[in-house]
């Protein structure tokens, strides 16, 4: 009897292991699809602003884009934010999966056509968030270098005469997913150097500062793979940004 029970437990563990491995493969394939479809320009349904609308540009990486958000693009945070702000606002999603603030990283945001589209939108309000991908050991060249590179990106938006407000967001935590943090993101660096550098940039340029690390700390259940928010996580993100805008 004990032998049969042990065999059943072993069999159950194997089944669970196969299912978990399958889920990991699906998650990885989903992110790759987001990368390549984004590169083909197929996943950015940008809106034309009506005359008199306040134009809001949400700039960032896959967290802004909405990778793994069920119900994308309507459930991605920029779309949810647009619905919350309501009539008189046009909110566009300029998030690009895998991209970095640093121009010398392996996937710099400034090298993408979407970056120029974000500039040409001539937004009244810009909400920017980078750092998760910059934290990777292969791309990290130190906090001062990150600040200098991110500064150049910020200044390119501040140089637009249309801009009235700009917010910079510190990225949320990165948790383990089946035993490790995915995509080579350095979770300690996101918590420490990236967060500190983002605060420094907010002070340097007098930007609104939104600390998503603090907002999402302890809320692992709101992340699909430990890095990307679920639809509920995207809703909380949108609510946080909405509150910041309304406080102005």
Where are each of the predicted segments found?
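Serine-esterase "nucleophile elbow" of acetyl-processing enzymes
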Residues: 33-97, 113-120
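Alpha-helical cap/lid subdomain in secreted, periplasmic
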Residues: 17-18, 110-248
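N-terminal Sec-pathway targeting helices
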Residues: 5-25
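Acidic/histidine-rich helix-loop elements
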Residues: 65-73, 93-110, 136, 140-144, ...
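Residue-level detector of flexible, active-site-proximal loop/helix-junction positions
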Residues: 63, 98-100, 173, 216
């Amino acid at each position: 009897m004990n032998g049969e029970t042990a065999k059943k437990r072993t069999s159950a563990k194997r089944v669970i292991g196969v299912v978990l491995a399958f889920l990991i493969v699906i998650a990885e394939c989903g992110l790759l699809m987001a990368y390549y479809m984004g590169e083909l320009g197929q996943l950015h349904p940008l809106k034309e602003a009506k005359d008199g609308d306040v134009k809001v540009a949400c700039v960032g990486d896959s967290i802004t884009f909405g990778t793994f958000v069920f119900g994308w693009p309507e459930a991605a945070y920029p779309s949810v934010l647009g619905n919350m702000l309501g009539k008189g606002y046009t909110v566009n999603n300029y998030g690009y999966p895998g991209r970095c603030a640093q121009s010398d990283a392996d996937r710099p945001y400034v090298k993408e056509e979407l970056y120029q589209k974000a500039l040409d939108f001539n937004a009244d309000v810009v909400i920017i968030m980078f750092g998760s991908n910059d934290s990777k050991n292969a791309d990290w060249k130190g906090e001062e270098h990150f600040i200098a590179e991110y500064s150049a990106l910020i200044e390119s938006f501040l140089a637009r005469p249309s801009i009235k407000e700009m917010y910079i967001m510190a990225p949320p935590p990165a948790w383990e997913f089946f035993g490790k943090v995915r995509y080579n993101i350095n979770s300690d660096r996101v918590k420490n150097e990236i967060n500190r550098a983002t605060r420094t940039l907010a002070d340097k340029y007098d930007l609104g500062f939104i600390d998503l690390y603090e907002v999402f700390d302890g809320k692992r259940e709101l992340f699909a793979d430990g890095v990307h928010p679920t639809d509920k996580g995207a809703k909380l993100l949108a609510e946080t940004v909405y509150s910041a805008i309304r406080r102005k």
